[in-house]
Amino acid sequence: MKYSHIGIPTTSAFEGEIDLPELKMTVSDHENNPFGIQWQRYWEDAPYPHLVKTVPHVAFEVDDLNAALIGQNVIIRPNSPSDGLIVAFIEVGGAPVELMQYIDPEEKLS
């Protein structure tokens, strides 16, 4: 497991906004800073759990998403928000955690 980013929900505008209409959210690029901070503003009709839309989450890259989900409280089932990436969210101690698997692990994991 490798740290990827922290996603911080906000209702305010932020620098470098990227609209993602298919996901019903606006984000910043977490790769444009050394700490992986990603701002996230969810659109009114975004179909995500309240926990994900209101509480910051930490995201980790995993080699095997299905194995990482065993025994976890899955709150967003595995899905593919972009080409080459599968993600799921779990709840751990009241906080959302994003698990990410790149289809081609050499692309991101080192």
Regions found by a protein language model. Give the residues of each.
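Vicinal oxygen chelate
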Residues: 1-32, 36-48, 73-110
